[in-house]
From Swiss-Prot:
Keywords: Cell membrane, Copper, Electron transport, Glycoprotein, GPI-anchor, Lipoprotein, Membrane, Metal-binding, Signal, Transport. This is Uclacyanin-2. It comes from the Eukaryota. Residues 1-29 form the signal peptide. Residues 141-169 have a biased composition (Low complexity). It is a lipid-anchor; GPI-anchor. Glycans are attached at residue 86. GO terms for cellular component: plasma membrane; plasmodesma; side of membrane. PROSITE patterns: PHYTOCYANIN (PS51485). GO terms for molecular function: electron transfer activity; metal ion binding. It is found in: Cell membrane. The keyword Ion transport does not apply.
Amino acid sequence: MAMNGLSKMAVAAATALLLVLTIVPGAVAVTYTIEWTTGVDYSGWATGKTFRVGDILEFKYGSSHTVDVVDKAGYDGCDASSSTENHSDGDTKIDLKTVGINYFICSTPGHCRTNGGMKLAVNVVAGSAGPPATPTPPSSTPGTPTTPESPPSGGSPTPTTPTPGAGSTSPPPPPKASGASKGVMSYVLVGVSMVLGYGLWM
């Protein structure tokens, strides 16, 4: 009888572990690294990406730039006077906490309005149980043309030349690993747990 109770506890524990591991992929936050500089089409970069509550935007930028969290009016008018956050440390991490469109601009005069502007709007949705999408950070080396992530079929992309800013003389760092590999690993753990759980039933 004691063995039967022990087996039931093991099955219950394996089932609980399986349930937790099934939920984990949706709970893994993705960090999107953004090379925050002039001459980048940030609206194009954000298109097609799914940002979720809990994800992190990591802005990397030179000393001539800022990251300001603004409302739609501040975004549209490139006005940071009513910003809720103002950063100038060169490596700013912002947790996406609210569902809806989140707005970011550079408040350095001329940067928000020039060459498409240093402004970013991301639509944030509630978390889900699926694995996160692979983020692709925008990057550009000052003085080097930038192109869209995927050029339109039948035509060639039109490059733009960014204006070099103070403190932005080195090329951007390579993209960071995405959260997608974490999601795949979670599914591997779920599979292993299922096999182990099946062994307990036998």
